[in-house]
UniProtKB/Swiss-Prot annotation:
Enzyme class (EC, first level): transferase
Cross-referenced SMART domains: RING (SM00184)
InterPro entries (alphabetical): ATL1/ATL16-like (IPR044600), Znf_RING (IPR001841), Znf_RING/FYVE/PHD (IPR013083)
Substrates-to-products reaction catalysed: S-ubiquitinyl-[E2 ubiquitin-conjugating enzyme]-L-cysteine + [acceptor protein]-L-lysine = [E2 ubiquitin-conjugating enzyme]-L-cysteine + N(6)-ubiquitinyl-[acceptor protein]-L-lysine
Pfam families cross-referenced by the UniProt entry: zf-RING_2
Assigned protein family: Belongs to the RING-type zinc finger family. ATL subfamily.
GO cellular component, one term: membrane
Name the UniProt record assigns to this protein: RING-H2 finger protein ATL57
Protein EC: 2.3.2.27
GO molecular function: transferase activity; zinc ion binding
Subcellular location: Membrane
TM spans (from-to): 51-71
Amino acid sequence: METKHLRKLLQLYQACGGEQELTKTVQNVTSSPLTPTPPPQPPSALDSTMALTIFILLVALFFMGFFSVYFRHFADSSSSTVDISSMPRTRSSRMSPRRLSTSVVVSRPYSFRRGLDSQAVRSLPVYRYTKAAKQRNEDCVICLSDFEEGETVKVIPHCGHVFHVDCVDTWLSSYVTCPLCRSNQLFSDKDLGMQEPPDQDSAEEHDTCDGVDTCVRRCSSCSSLGQRTGLERSLSL
C-alpha cells in the first residue's frame, strides 16, 4: 500500500515539471517588479497655432486703426482749401507744378466778405494783351501764369495792372482791392462819374446823417436863443 502511494506522488511530481522548473517559476514571479503607470501629462498652456493667429489679428487691427485715423486727418485738412480744378483749363494747363503749388489759397474765414458790385466788375475795361504795350506786369499774379500774345485781359484803370478776366472777376467778387498793389481805388477820376449811384443803404445812411445834423443845428440854435433871452431878462432887471 505504501509503495502505491509513493508511486503516485512521483508521478505527480514528474507531471509538475520537476523541482528546477518549479523554482524557476517561483523566481521569475518574485523577481519581476510591477511597472508603475506613468502620470498623465498636464495640458499645454496655449497652442502655438492659436498664439500665431491671435498675433496676426492684433497686428491687422492696429494697422486698420492707424490708416483710418490718418486718412480722416488728411481728408479734414484737404477740405479747408479751395479746389483749383474749378479754374479754366486753358490756364491751369499752362501752369507749371512749381507755380501750381504756390497758387493763392482762399481760406474759410474770408468767405463771408463782400466784394465789389457785379456791375462795377463788368465795367472794367477789357482788351487784348500785346507785349509791345509794355504793361506793368507780364503775368497774372492770381493764377501765376504768363500772358500770351492776343489774350483777353482786364485792366484796373487806377493802377494800370492787368489780369485774366476770370481770375480778376473771381477776386473782386470777394475783395474790393487790386490783387497786386492792394489799392482800394480801382477807377480813375474820370471814370468815377460813370459809376452807378449809391445803393439804398448808403442813401438812407446819408439821410440819417443829414437829419442828425439838422437836429444838432436846431438844438444849438434853441440853446443860443434861450441863453440870449435869459441874458436880456437879467439886463432888464
